[in-house]
Amino acid sequence: MSLADHIFIDMCNDILTNGTSTEGEKVRPHWPDGTPAYTIKKFGVVNRYDLSKEFPALTLRRTAIKSCVDELLWIWQKKSNNVHELKSHIWDSWADENGSIGKAYGYQMQVKHQYKEGMMDQVDRVLYDLKENPYSRRIMTNIYVHEDLHEMNLYPCAYSMTFNVTKEEGSEQLTLNGILNQRSQDVLTANNWNVCQYAVLLHMFAQVCGMKAGELVHVIADAHIYDRHIPLIEELISREPLPAPKFWLNPEVKDFYDFTPDDVRLEDYETHPQIKNIPVAI
């Protein structure tokens, strides 16, 4: 059965049982009708996914892998902050009349910085180090740039990736691991979406650097379930986990910038029905 499902169920039960409520407090998020969007939250949630064992897509409900990869590449490959370059409309609420979300997410990825080796943006620096200095303990990205926060329509939720390379005993191939740091997460709408995105990213980076994907560690400072999501979460975690899907990444792609969503597939992906009409706090 899917290990990712069990991790998700345990996390949700922990939040519902041991979390704290923001009801009655001053909160920024609200529902479309103007009502404050309160949460039950848990501080410092850490989940670990061994990508060598399975791809961590939930079977409790379907995760739209093409759409989440499209968004991942929008940020990491296109380095864009314009929602018109996305196939989905997830970000429309935070875009201005021109489609821009300001100096957030992809904008920060395309900013070049001076290094001893020359000018590079954060993505190219990671790829350079993974190929030239894989055992460096300094391979990371960070898009939570304080001087630009006032020009971001949405502060980054998933804001930092740290990459770490190991070598298993008896193996000639290096293993690429990663830590995803997230300041805040809406568990129902975004948890598995983000997990699948960064699992794909690790697989992509590993492939183009001649490595194999290892462990993804997901650190969430504020993991929360919104008040109007509680019955939906309870329904979701009552379902029986199914076998994890098989992950396919086009082996012909050797350059990260050549990947498209069509180069990613989940095979034998059997899931429970989707939960529809999920209210989204803004």
Locate predicted features.
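Terminal, non-catalytic protein-protein interaction segments that mediate quaternary/complex assembly
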Residues: 1-282
